[in-house]
Amino acid sequence: RSTLFPYTTLFRSTNRDVYDQAFELAVNAEVRRGIVEDGVRPDGRKLDEVRPLSSQVGILPRVHGSSLFTRGVTQALNIITLAPLSYAQEVDTMETTGGKRYYIHHYNAPSYTVGEPGRIGSPGRREIGHGYLAERALIPVLPTIEEFPYTIRSVTEIMSQNGSTSMAATCSSCMALMDAGVPIKNPVSGVAMGLMIDLPKNQEITAQDIDKAYVLTDLMDAEDFAGDMDFKVTGTKNGVTALQMDMKVHGLPVEIMEKAIKQSHAGRMFILEHLTTVIKSPRKELSKYAPKIEKLMINPEKIGAVIGKGGEMINRITAETGAEVDIEDSGLVTIASSDATKIKKALDWIKSLVEEPEVGKIYEGTVISIKDFGAFINIMPGIDGMLHISQITDKRLNKVTEVLHEGDEIRVRIIAIDDKGRISLSMRNLD
């Protein structure tokens, strides 16, 4: 405001906002002049220089994974929570239904992070957009649910900010995922690129103007407000995973975009090297506080046997074992619990429901009906076999009821399965 003091007589009857706008324009003009004429940024950095970096992992011992990423004044705390697949977010759009998100990134940046008071309410467009960009940045390197049967929630809490918070969210979530033991394919880093063009406003930019285009690595707030572009790039050592760009000009030639992408690669690699010095690869074991999950692939045709009529069977398994059971349409079954004994009990139960009958194997069965020629035995849920009277004992029998009665529990061996799937059983020579 002291800069504008000589001119205050011109604004005595003007709203205070005019002063604020004039001051902002003066600052923006000075930021642009420093970069274009002197090649110096507001904090003294070179055009391709990244702010000082500092990071930690495992700073919150009770959560499943955590990290703190600091770049200059911008600081992001990330927390990872692992849960069974049933916790996936159901997604319905105008075009599709039934989609699920197994990786969810939530981004929060309260007013206090920029030194202002304010209410904390539902997320706005900025929070949703930044969270979605950081989410998209990590999706290409995440394991499949078959490889890692967990729903993953990543929450970034911005602690302080001066530009590039979405890229800080990307870096902090990458480190927290590795701290949690999520087997990501490669670490991911992100950097925001800026642009100052030394041309009159509204003048068309051509390829010949590339020498007048000043590309900035690791954009800060003052440069974002004064500049012509905010271009966010995330990726691994092998390639780019996400891009997002805002422009204040009417278009950019390919040559300037190429320059920005090449310069962003150097910035990303510098940040990536820093991340991998803090945590090089995903931890081999999950947190002791994370739920234990076992997976089993079954024939999709057997899903009905596990679920049962009206969900009766799966509800019974959950109630009697205390484990949580989820089934995907692909046949992937996941069993989750904090107790390994409960998981094993549920797993064995499900295996017995979906097991295919095997010739030569001995089963515990129940006599379900008696006929003159033999008996029908239930050996597995939904699977019966026929025990001929000649296969009950080595001695000759006149009636099946001399040995067997409905409801008897007996041991039988499968001796044959014909091409129609009919099973022949025997009680002879079981030892």
What are these regions (language model features)?
Residues T3-L10:
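Short, small-residue-biased leader/transition segments that mark boundaries at the very start
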Residues T8, S154-T156, S160, L243-K248, ...:
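Short, hydrophobic beta-strand segments
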Residues V57-I80, N162-P183, G304-I314:
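Conserved phosphate/anionic-ligand binding catalytic regions in large, soluble enzymes, centered on
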Residues I59, H64-Y150, G239-V249, P253, ...:
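Glycine-rich, flexible beta-strand/loop modules in the N-terminal catalytic cores of phosphate-handling
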Residues R101-Y107, S111, H130-I145, L177, ...:
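Structured alpha-helical segments in the cores of large, soluble enzyme domains
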Residues I104-V114, I145-P149, T234-V240, H250, ...:
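Flexible hinge/switch segments at interdomain interfaces of large molecular machines
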Residues L177-K284:
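Mobile "lid/hinge" segments at catalytic clefts and subdomain interfaces of large enzymes
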Residues Y289-I293, P300-D431:
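Single-stranded RNA-binding regions, centering on S1/OB-family and related RNA-binding modules
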